[in-house]
């Protein structure tokens, strides 16, 4: 499915996680903040490039971006709306909530490298089950910037022990979409008490012989919004991404 076709389906009301959609095309996290907070967030992202790799930034009020020819208000499957850091609703369309002062940031997403993992024979459990990737707040703090601060959020994929090195090698070639894992193995080292109870997304089975592998996650900006409490923000619903018009290969390094 092309990015344009996927966006049209979401605009028409399809609400599903986008992992596995539009293979070969880059997916992105969305965070839209008032212009007054835009510099603080841009600096936050610059200081935390592993979790917040910025792919594109709009002018205030713009509803499309150079890598996203659709409408940022309607063409993602689901959005989260925050007021003073509190999640107030999850909706499929934010047209009525959009403001002329909103600056939108498209942040790299690890869904982008999943096609490369599958091609190399590395299983991706949430794609196998048709679910959402599990995501967790961690005990690692991001570097603060201005009024923005918050914890690192990670996504987790179980990987057979014999293929962990392959997964690291493949994903390290995609630094603009989180790159190599930030942690391999014991969840408790990240402050994760129950691997079966993710903070975002859905749990997946870790089978015998598999190791949990954790990548920095673009839900980190929303965790920063919850902690920093700007007056208003809009983000994608975790796992329900912006499918861009950029190719995965554009973010692949040798």
From Swiss-Prot:
<dbReference type="InterPro" id="IPR009906">
    <property type="entry name" value="D-Glu_cyclase"/>
</dbReference>
<dbReference type="InterPro" id="IPR038021">
    <property type="entry name" value="Putative_hydro-lyase"/>
</dbReference>
<comment type="similarity">
    <text>Belongs to the D-glutamate cyclase family.</text>
</comment>
<protein>
    <recommendedName>
        <fullName>Putative hydro-lyase SACE_1553</fullName>
        <ecNumber>4.2.1.-</ecNumber>
    </recommendedName>
</protein>
<keyword id="KW-0456">Lyase</keyword>
<dbReference type="Pfam" id="PF07286">
    <property type="entry name" value="D-Glu_cyclase"/>
</dbReference>
<dbReference type="GO" id="GO:0016829">
    <property type="term" value="F:lyase activity"/>
</dbReference>
<dbReference type="InterPro" id="IPR016938">
    <property type="entry name" value="UPF0317"/>
</dbReference>
